[in-house]
Structure formats: structure tokens, C-alpha cells
Amino acid sequence: MSLKRLGFQPLACKRDMRRPELNRDSGWLIGVDILVVFLGLIGQIFLSRSLLSADYGLLIILLDAFATIFILVDAGLPTLLNRDGPKAPGMARKAAHRILKLQAVIALPFIAIAFIGSTVIWGDLPFGLLGICAAITLMHVASYPHRSLLRCLGEARIEAMTKLLERTVTTSLYGCLMIFGINEIHWWALAFFIGAMLGLISAIIFGEKVGKNNQGEGSLPELWNSNKSLLMGALPFAVTLGVLPYVTKLEKFLLSYFHSYEDVALFHVAQLAWLAGLLVPQGVRAALLPVLGEARTQEQLITRMSKAQSLGFILLPVGLFFGHVLVSNLIPLAFSNDYVQAVEIFEILLAGWALTLLAVPWYVGLQAGPHPWRFTGLLGLVVVSAFISGMLLIPEYGVTGAAWSSVCGSAVMFYASRWMNRTKLPQQIWLDVSAIICLATGYLLSTGNGLAWIGIITVIPAGFSIVEIRHQMKNSEEE
């Protein structure tokens, strides 16, 4: 099926080429990601109702463990393409090919490490199950170069559709397995494998088609001149990616060590809803990185960061309200009684979601700036703080302690990213007020306290931000 029939018409003419744009691209990424997460939640409901809690928790740990290993194959290279590609659209496709070749070489030692490590830790499990789980995470990593290619060429909408295709196929296959009463864990892993494979194939096909039709002047930075300089330039992002999985997976690893796979499954259900909401700041981040990377002056950088901050203020009360209402009703309705406590855990995680959303302009500014190692250091601080708090809280308080450990990591990201970036943006007072209000709201919601309604205060900076964005749009039209 052609892109034109789907309504996507990437044009070769330079004046008609799409460029990265924050509101449009984040709208596509967030909008489709909401559908992806909705389908993902349905898939998790199928999983939790068809597999024993122990098997469900085991599958989660297997996928998380392989993802933690193979994310290093990424080497930070697609992030570089996402940052530098908008400056040289005519060279972006060749850059994606180059990244894939480098990643194929990098993957070899990590495949060996994964094979040896998995057979030692889970030697009693079928090799086929381990192989399927490993292949799933490898295919996800292999899809990143072409998805970054699409995004840096202004086609975040097509990137989003490849994700939707993958999740639709996976969830549909999960539904078939549930209907036929299949409860063997390897069949469910195979369904995920098929979805990931189709997601990879679609990303490559559409990325190649869009890349061929893009022309444009400009050249990639000097670090792209050789593989050595390219890998060194991507090293901060590679180290970051090595740390990044622990930001969302560390608590589950600690729970599996100190408690049980059943507790991992309970925390995972709560975290699913949290990760669903986390796609909002991730969508803004994904759209903001090429926009900041394209900024030529400090004034442009501040203007674009300020716009992202305003967007965060607007999304904050919406996320708090709908997150609480939807999850508090959805989890008891969709999951068995074994997972009812996940609502309380989610309310705690909701505070961490808010802090992550508010931190987006600052940590993306670090990522796109001249000192990307600062972003690596930031994530290192987040993981260390989450690990220390997890070691203190999880052995004693279990799943609840894991939730507060996650919030501690988000709080460190919020405050440390602002301190490390040091960019001055408007509404700083409201930023601090919103953070404190969100922390209090998460705690009060988790305890069932009616004072949780103080979260409505976040509507005030949202109103100011709407006025500011309208003013910016009016000035843009006049120009």
C-alpha cells in the first residue's frame, strides 16, 4: 500500500518538505500513543486473565531483562539522527543505513552475553521462550533508526502509525489466544514477537520511502565524518540508554529479589497505567528534541523551551484528573481481585508522572545542548536515588515502597534537570507550586483523603499557559 493512498504525501520539492514542528508532531505522537496504550492495556488484561500471576510476572521480568541488555545496541545513534537529521534532510536516509550497519556489529557481543546470562539465571526455562523474548527486544531496537528517520523528516505521524500497527496485531493475537483458552507462556511471547516483527518491517518500508523523496541542503555535523567520531559523539546517549531502562524497571527487579513474581505482576499492572500517562511527556520529548536541535540562537532555544513548558502546564490538570478517574474505575473492572491494590499504587505513581511532565523542557534541553553528558549524569542521579530509596523502602513496604521509590527518582529528575540546565523560563514560581501540589495530591489520593482536590490548583498555570500560547499564535499570524 502506498503512502499516497494512506493520505501521506511526502514531497520531493524542497519548498513543500515537511519539517519537524512541536505542536503538530507531539500531537500525532501523543494521540496515537494513547491508542497504542489503550490496546496495550487490553492486551495486558488478556495476559493477566489467561496466565497465572507467577507466569505473568516471569514474562514481564524476561522482557525487561532482555530490554535492559539490548538497549545498549542502540548506542545512542538514532538519538543523534533525530537531533542532527533536520539540519540535513537529504542525507538522513544514508545516515539511518549507516546506523543499522553499526548496530549489527555492536549487537554480536550483547547477543552472546544475553545467551550465557539467561541460561545461567533461567536454565530451567525452554530455550525457545528465551530466544523469542530476546528477539522481541532486538527487533524493537532495530526499528529505532528508521523511526528516528521519519521523525526528523517531519513524518512523526507515520512513525506513530507503525507503532499502532505493531500494537494492534499483538493485541489481536492476544485476544485469539484468550478465546481459544491457551495459557502456555511461550504462545503469548510468540504473539508479541509477530507484532514486533511487523512493526519493524513497516518502519523500514515507510522510512525508506520517505527518505528517498526528501531533498534538501545542509550537511551533518563533523562527528558524522567517521564511524569513530560518530560513536564517540553518540557515547553520552549510549551511556544514557544503558542507564535509562533502570528508571522504569529497577523497582521490578528489586521486588523480584526481595519479594515474589506475584508482587512484580501487581506493580506492573499499576505501572502500566502510569506508563500510559508517561507517553504524554515522552511524546512531547520526542517532538521537542529535533525542534531544539534545529534552534540556531539562544533566543530561539528559550522560546521553544517556554512553549514546551506551557504545553506541560496545560496537560498537567488533564492528566491528574483523567488519570485518577479512569484508572480507579478501569483496574477493578478489567483485572481480577488479585490486582485491586494496583489502584492505590497508581495514585502514588501519578505524582511521579506529573514531575516527569514538568521536567521535560529542561532535560530535553540538556539532551539537545552542547553538553549531552549532563543528561547522562542526570539519569545517573535518578537511578542512584531510586536505587537507594528502593533498598530502604521495598524490603519493608513491598509494592507501596516501590511506588514511592519511583516518585523519588522523578523528583530528582525534576529538580536536578532545572539546576543542571539553568535556563530561565517564565512562570518558575508556578512550576514549584505545581510540583508540591502534585506530590501532595498523589499521597492524598492513595490514602483516600478528600483533600486530594487541592490538585485543582494546577488549573491556574494551565489557564495562563493557554493565554500565552494564543498570544504567540496571534503574533505568528501577524508576522
Residue ranges, per PLM feature:
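Membrane-water interface segments that mark the loop-to-transmembrane alpha-helix transition
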Residues: 24-36, 62, 67, 71-119, ...
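Helix-loop junctions and terminal segments of transmembrane helices
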Residues: 73-89, 152, 270-310, 363-368
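Hydrophobic transmembrane helix module of multi-pass membrane transport proteins
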Residues: 101-240
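Membrane-interface junctions at transmembrane-helix termini in multi-pass inner-membrane proteins
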Residues: 84, 139-162, 293, 350-381, ...
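Interhelical loop/hinge segments that connect adjacent transmembrane helices in multipass membrane
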Residues: 6-18, 131, 157, 185-191, ...
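Transmembrane helical elements of multi-pass membrane transporters/channels
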Residues: 25-40, 166, 170, 191-211, ...
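Alpha-helical transmembrane segments of multi-pass membrane transport and lipid-handling proteins
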Residues: 2-6, 73-74, 97-125, 132, ...
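Signature of the first transmembrane helix
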Residues: 3-9, 21-78, 111, 115, ...
